[in-house]
A protein has these predicted regions:
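Glycine-rich hexapeptide-repeat left-handed beta-helix
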Residues: 304-450
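N-terminal glycine-rich phosphate-binding loop and ensuing alpha1 helix
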Residues: 2-62, 70-73, 109-115
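Glycine/small-residue-rich pyrophosphate-binding loop that anchors the diphosphate of NDP-sugar donors
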Residues: 167-170, 259, 387, 405
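Catalytic-core segments of class I nucleotidyltransferases/pyrophosphorylases
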Residues: 147-240
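Extended, small-residue-rich solenoid/repeat segments and analogous flexible loops
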Residues: 201-308, 314-317
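Catalytic cores of nucleotide-enabled group-transfer and carboxylate-activating enzymes in metabolic
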Residues: 5-6, 20, 25, 39-41, ...
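Short glycine-rich anion-binding loops that position phosphate/pyrophosphate groups of nucleotides
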Residues: 13-15, 57, 99-102, 130-131, ...
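Conserved beta-loop-beta/alpha segment of the NTase-like Rossmann-fold superfamily
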Residues: 62, 66-144, 180-183
Length: 450
């Protein structure tokens, strides 16, 4: 990638045929806004200077793209201030792309730039061939294959509409020539973006096309039916990417893997698994069925069965589930077992600890090789504030124990089943906090005789 390159994303169209409270550019593709896919592709292409042009009525795109470090301009603002805008980028090349085409390929963009520079073009369009060209601008060539023009669908003649080579909506421009064309467009009150190519050709600028083999680069979310198609396409693309990298996905039913997910070799993904956000999974794991992981890190040789995990870390060799829930800010150490109906929140659980069933561990720091009996609850909330529970190495927590924070159970200490522990239990001690059992002999006989 050349050092002096910038990109402009066009996200200005308002589509009344799409029933939504959000812009089409902000509709999700695998839980990520479409314009976010475009920004990611540009970053992978090596472009950091990215501006997004939005409609004058937009209220949803601007906050999102600015959060991603992109500049944002209203359409009327960019038309009125286009000259000043371009002068900021008057060296090098500028890439103009559509904001509703999520499958633009960074490799294609880089190769198109190389051809643009090597051929000395003032403008280079990225084109491809589609089976049904309706709705796309046609690439018109001469008898010897030379590029003559790019014609919009609404302006195309009958013979031009039969052409199957179409524009992807992505153009590399020489910045100085684009600046000159914009000056003319503004002077004649034309649409600066749509007419820039025609103005450059009128100036005698050199016009070229880079042909992309995959027609996916032109796919757009023009309506909800098309969005459904794009989602399925994106889902299959991600699944294939991981299969080719050595991940085992024997059945793809219900599997959804987002674009920022990393999965190690030899890991198996079972049906109903959803991997969302920035997820990193190690080697040799078994994930699923019916498991959701979001913005989390999972180590090697981990089993996650019927489990949900959010913004947490699960280290090597853990066996988790079924029906476990790992809530944000939790760290589950090596070889930890979390069984059925176990919930962990904002807690650290160290190596070899077993929490087998029906237990809540919240706001807690748990040591190594601790055993939790069934029905243990860390009572962390007073109604006004939350406190932490500390359980040291090799402790044994009896069934149906309530640990009322702030409280510490010492190393090697035990709590008796059914206890409500409100005071610290010293190391190697037994904490008993329950009423003494009383047996009333013959009570049933007397009751029946009443």
């Amino acid at each position: 990638m050349s050092e002096k390159c910038a990109a402009v994303i066009l996200a200005t169209e308002e589509n009344p045929s799409v029933t939504t409270y959000r812009s089409i550019y902000m509709m999700n593709l695998l839980s990520k806004p479409i314009v976010g896919w475009v920004i990611t592709a540009l970053r992978r292409c090596g472009i950091e200077d990215i501006s997004v042009v939005v409609s004058d009525n937009d209220v949803t795109i601007t906050p999102y793209v600015e959060l991603l470090g992109c500049a944002s301009y209203k359409r009327k603002q960019i038309e009125n201030e286009s000259i000043d805008f371009m002068k900021k980028h008057c060296e090098g090349n500028i890439l103009v792309v559509r904001g509703d085409a999520p499958f633009i390929d960074p490799i294609v963009l880089r190769n198109a730039l190389l051809e643009h520079e090597n051929n000395g073009n003032e403008v280079t369009v990225v084109s491809t061939q589609v089976d049904v060209p309706f709705g796309y601008s046609r690439i018109v060539r001469g008898d010897s294959g030379e590029l003559l023009s790019v014609v919009e669908e609404k302006h195309a003649a009958a013979d031009e509409k039969k052409i199957r080579e179409v524009s992807s909506g992505s153009y590399w421009f020489d910045a100085i020539m684009l600046l000159r064309s914009l000056e003319t467009c503004v002077k004649f009150h034309k649409d600066a973006v749509d007419n820039a190519v025609n103005e450059i050709v009128a100036f005698g600028g050199k016009f070229g096309a880079y042909y992309a083999d995959s027609p996916d680069i032109v796919l757009r979310a023009s309506n909800r039916r098309r969005l459904l198609t794009l989602n399925e396409k994106a889902r299959k693309n991600e699944i294939l990417r991981h299969i080719e990298a050595g991940v085992d996905i024997p059945c793809v039913d219900g599997v959804m893997i987002e674009s920022d997910v990393e999965i190690g070799v030899g890991t198996t993904i079972l049906p109903g698994t959803i991997l969302r956000g920035k997820v990193k999974i190690g080697k040799g794991c078994k994930i699923g069925p019916n498991t959701l992981i979001e913005n989390s890190t999972v180590g090697d040789n981990v089993i996650l069965n019927e489990t949900q995990c959010y913004q947490s870390t699960v280290k090597n060799g853990c066996n988790i589930g079924p029906f476990a829930h790992i809530r944000p800010n939790s760290v589950v150490g090596d070889c930890v077992h979390l069984g059925n109906f176990v919930e962990v929140k904002n807690s650290s659980i160290d190596t070899g600890t077993k929490v087998s069933h029906l237990t809540y561990v919240g706001d807690s720091d748990v040591g190594k090789h601790v055993n939790f009996g069934c029905g243990t609850v860390t009572v962390n909330y007073t109604g006004r504030a939350k406190f932490r529970t500390k359980i040291m190495d090799d402790a044994f927590i009896g069934c149906n124990t309530n640990l009322v924070a702030p409280v510490t159970v010492g190393a090697g200490a035990y709590t008796a089943a059914g206890s409500t522990i409100t005071e610290d239990v010293p190391d190697s001690s037994l904490g008993i906090a329950r009423a003494r059992q009383v047996n009333k002999l013959g009570w049933r006989i007397n009751k029946d005789n009443e």
